[in-house]
Amino acid sequence: MRAVIAAGGTAGHINPALAIAQEIVKNEPQSKIIFIGREDGMEKRLVDQAGFELYPIEIHGFSRSFKPKEIIFNIKSVYCALKGSIIAGKLYREFKPDIVIGCGGYVSGPVVRKAAKMGIKTAIHEQNSFPGVTTKLLSKCADIIFAPNEDAAKLIGKPQKTYICGNPVREALFTANRESLRREWGISDKLCVVSFGGSLGARAINRICAQLMRSELDSGIRFHHIHATGQYGTELFSQLMGEMHIDKSNPDIEVYEYIKNMPECLAVADLVISRSGA
């Protein structure tokens, strides 16, 4: 199989797309898969890390404001969408995919629409209970729609071509060995907490987890806390740690913008704190 997969914006779109790609390759090892996304987006890092090729296009969302600055931004977004459609068409003519799959993010819009216009089979996967604007627009032209649950399927409103499949999960999340990893990381006798608020970050979770770290330190219990601040939470969390006199060099407190080895972290955790979402 030759497949093109479009996903971008947040890990909630990208990781399910990677799970789909990995399952395709697992079932058909000779398959060739190319991702489409932004060169400067999170998809570039995650797709490269997973060992797949990313074909870059520039794409932006649209603002719903009518302020002059936002109107100019929307004009630029239209231009990028048209340009992205042309670039996608060039890729399709060269690569000749059997199917194009959109997994969310603004990048999916022009990529899937162009494939449909060229007569290429298309599918879209929605990860959230409340389908996004891109999914609703693409539901008209996609051949197959995959939804996470009944509620999402009803909101999409295309029952004749919608299949409920849940959210694809990477196989690595089921294969990590808890006990060996805890020994390797030196935390066999410690309470391990893993916390994160999504790839962009969640202000409330960052505040609560900083308070929790302070409580863990004051309690005297043996603990190890791994926290991801998200893209927009790095400065805030650093500030919170300073305000609460949390030593950033403490080996039992690990703080990252994004947890790259999530399967291993989830395997060793005694408690996971996260936001809802894809």
Q: Which residues does each predicted region cover?
A:
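Active-site-proximal region of nucleotide-activated glycan assembly enzymes
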Residues: 2, 34, 42, 53, ...
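Conserved nucleotide-sugar phosphate-binding/catalytic loop shared by glycosyltransferases and other
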Residues: 3-10, 30-80, 165, 231-233
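Short amphipathic alpha-helix
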Residues: 13-25
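Glycine-rich phosphate-binding loop signature in dinucleotide/nucleotide-binding domains
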Residues: 28-29, 90-98, 185-188, 268
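Glycosyltransferases and closely related glycan-assembly transferases
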Residues: 87-100, 107-123, 136, 140-141
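Hydrophobic acceptor-binding patch used for acceptor engagement in glycosyltransferases
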Residues: 100, 271-272
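Short glycine-/small-residue-rich Rossmann-like dinucleotide-binding loops
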Residues: 104-105, 198, 230, 276-277
